[in-house]
Amino acid sequence: MQNDNKNTLMFIVSAFAILIGYQFFVLGPQQKKAEAEFRAKKAAEQQSAAKAGVTLDANGNPAPLRLSRDAAKALSPRIEVDTPALSGSIALKGARIDDLFLRKYDETTKKDSPPVELFRPEGAEHAWFADFGWAGANLPGLPDSRTVWTAAPGQVLRPNSPVTLTYDNGLGLTFTRVIAVDDQAMFTVTDSVKNNGTNGLQLAPYATVQRQGISDALGKNQIVHEGAIGVLGATDEQKLEMAKYGKWKKDKPLQSFDSVGGWTGITDKYWLAALIPGQNQAIKAQYRVTNVAGIDVYDVNFLGPVQVLNPGATVSQTTRLFAGAKTVPLLRKYEYGATPAPAIWEFWNKTKAEIPRFDDAVDWGMFRFFTRPIFNILEVFYKLVGNFGLAILLLTVVLKLVLYPMADKSYESMAKMKKIAPEVEKLKAKHKDDPAKQQQEMMALYQKEKINPMMGCLPMLIQIPVFYALYKVLTVTIEMRHAPFFGWIQDLSAPDPTTMFNLFGLIPWDPGSLPLIGAMIAHLGVWPLLYGFTMWLTTAMNPPAGDPIQQKIFQWFPVIFTFTLSGFAVGLVIYWCWSNVLTIFQQYIIMRRYKVENPIDQIIARLRGKTAGAT
């Protein structure tokens, strides 16, 4: 019995040693070879694609290929993609997903606007596509971007109607690719390889999302992340890994990550192309920027583990591709799959996500804990009223009610300070040569009247995080894009389209075309002017600043902020304007309670006086 135990123990130790040794001395080097082969293969394909069919410039260097979109599409036979959310095609050359339009989103708010373009074929300017395949050390005949796959005629990719592509390399390997799509934005790509030969092989699956050049506008917005993005790392240590276009190219052109599952891709402000491997699969992900024939190529890819393919056997790999708009409900639907997603306030809920932190594809910013709840509240209000502009007004009212006790004390303090302003001026005149005595007497007066002079700053300090959160939400969430309000406001995420400098559109002239000042006056429309008036009224209802220079500065604040905010999203201007109106109403009630003279009563008195005079 004792010998049996010893033998069993020796067997376990030996088996474990063999397993570790095989992993270290065989599979490890094979994985590295496969990885090197994959990187070399992709680099060679980029060089070949960039140089194929191009002319030379004056220096003898290859000039970048600049085909029209239709001409680039015509370089390959195609299979149509037709879903409720997507239209486009798959190239049989390379079996790439490289031609997609988003049916539910238009480029502009005009009625005849074309749909948003997501993917564009290689060869056209600013190409963007997804690629899949296999890499292996010293294996000839693996399909690449130039391989033309075979498909049965008449196939169309639709929900519940996948397409099948095949390729026989003539060297004993048969490759099959089955591409399926749902009715929203998720592709499922299943690759399989059958070994019809007599020798065993080692293969590693890969997937990549690549952009060949970007427009000048991308990556310039400091508020929004655009570039590489992913949630990568060990299962319990996954982090959001981001690389903005500019910094990615300049500071970190090559970044590598070891991960188990997760996801990675390339994002714009509103659109995302993300690769999602099996969540139990160990992968090596990479963010890479190279320059090929003058074009910056942005590449996000992952390489899966080496798989042994014995004679007569088949190996397979399934990768998902999200290609669409970053709508938060859709991202959370994919994040949790069939499991109901926990509510955002259920921080105690430990429901495991199928795609970890997928809704972080939306750039909530460093104050996610505040920005995200603001969006959720707006979304709830939108479902109630059916308009995001009204939802913003409703959110403002709710915030005012929540903060009412604190704000009430602040406005009460401000009203009292305005009431004793004449006494403060007398103290300043009396002790103008003794600042210490002046300060002492003023503090005594404040104590007597039970006034805290610092309370006046509280309303503004409270609004700062709300302002930031709403600004972020209006900037990064696609739900706000092209969201109308009323009248001329058709996009809450864009500045007011009118300006007083062309009489709000009556004169056919664009003030934005003026040099230097055009950007400042191009959107000085109705809502920014309403905001300026409400800010002036709010300032007038506050107690005057103690210092004359400060008084002059505060008088100019409404003008300065009117010009500044005119270039912001009009939804933000509407929020601030409505917030000012509610503040004025609250202050007016408090000032009437304490019988303090206020500008509203002065305006009403003047209007009555003029009316009486006219009568």
From Swiss-Prot:
Gene Ontology biological-process annotations: protein insertion into membrane; protein transport
Domain of life: Bacteria
GO molecular function, one term: membrane insertase activity
Localization per record: Cell inner membrane
One CC-aspect GO term: plasma membrane
Membrane topology recorded in Swiss-Prot or TrEMBL: Multi-pass membrane protein
Coiled-coil parts of chain: none
Keywords annotated in UniProt: Cell inner membrane, Cell membrane, Chaperone, Membrane, Protein transport, Transmembrane, Transmembrane helix, Transport
CDD domains in the record: 5TM_YidC_Alb3 (cd20070), EcYidC-like_peri (cd19961)
Disulphide-bridged cysteine pairs: none
Signal sequence annotation: none
Listed PANTHER family: CYTOCHROME C OXIDASE ASSEMBLY PROTEIN COX18, MITOCHONDRIAL (PTHR12428:SF65), OXA1 (PTHR12428)
Subunit description: Interacts with the Sec translocase complex via SecD. Specifically interacts with transmembrane segments of nascent integral membrane proteins during membrane integration.
Functional summary from the UniProt entry: Required for the insertion and/or proper folding and/or complex formation of integral membrane proteins into the membrane. Involved in integration of membrane proteins that insert both dependently and independently of the Sec translocase complex, as well as at least some lipoproteins. Aids folding of multispanning membrane proteins.
Stated name of the protein: Membrane protein insertase YidC
Source organism of this protein record: Caulobacter vibrioides (strain NA1000 / CB15N)
Gene: yidC
